[in-house]
Amino acid sequence: LMDGKIRLNAAAFWQEWDDFQFSRLDTSISPITLTYNVGNAESNGFEFDFTAMLAANWSLSGAASFVDSNLTSDYARNGVDVDAASGTALPRVPETKWNLSTRYGFGDDFFLQAAYMYTGDSYNTLFDGGTISTQRRTQKAYTVVNTAVGMERENWSAQVYVNNLTDERGSVWINAVTWDQRVTINQPRSVGVSFTRSF
């Protein structure tokens, strides 16, 4: 597009599962994770990515995905009482994810870059297990900002970076087992230097 200044890719998808499987750790049954057949499910969505050259030394890129995934049949562990009804959202699948990044070069070799990444809400498990530690909980949306400044030559590059600039603490996963519930968070703010050389 625009004489090669913009590149755009997009895709839509629709997927149906028969005998969808779900992994869950329940220490009242087994000390290891078990896989359950939970019926039928579907996942529909749309995703795209783009890169745009705003100037000879300035680029902008991004990507996004929008997913609707849920059960299409009721699930009952004991065959009678429904634990997850048809229409229940599948776990660990954010409905929305997107990112935006930019890179600006100046002088002959120097560059600045920044990236903004958003992960939407998701659920930690398929159904509520009946105890505090096995509750179905929402893993809240969070954002991460990464920045860097560096130098790039023909066969090497070096940069100083700050990942997770705002020190955002997002819940990557909240477990749902029969002992204490624990939350795994994303990596906190980190500052570093990297060097790359091509041979």
Question: What spans do the regions from the language model cover?
Answer:
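Extracytoplasmic loops and strand-loop junctions of Gram-negative outer membrane beta-barrel proteins
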Residues: 28-35, 80-86, 128-135, 141, ...
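Transmembrane beta-barrel architecture of outer membranes
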Residues: 33, 95-99, 142-146, 180, ...
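Short coil turns and loop connectors of transmembrane beta-barrels in diderm outer membranes
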Residues: 2-4, 18, 54-57, 68, ...
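Short sequence motifs at beta-strands and strand-loop junctions characteristic
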Residues: 2, 38-42, 90-97, 138-143, ...
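C-terminal beta-signal and adjacent terminal beta-strands/loops
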Residues: 118-128, 150-199
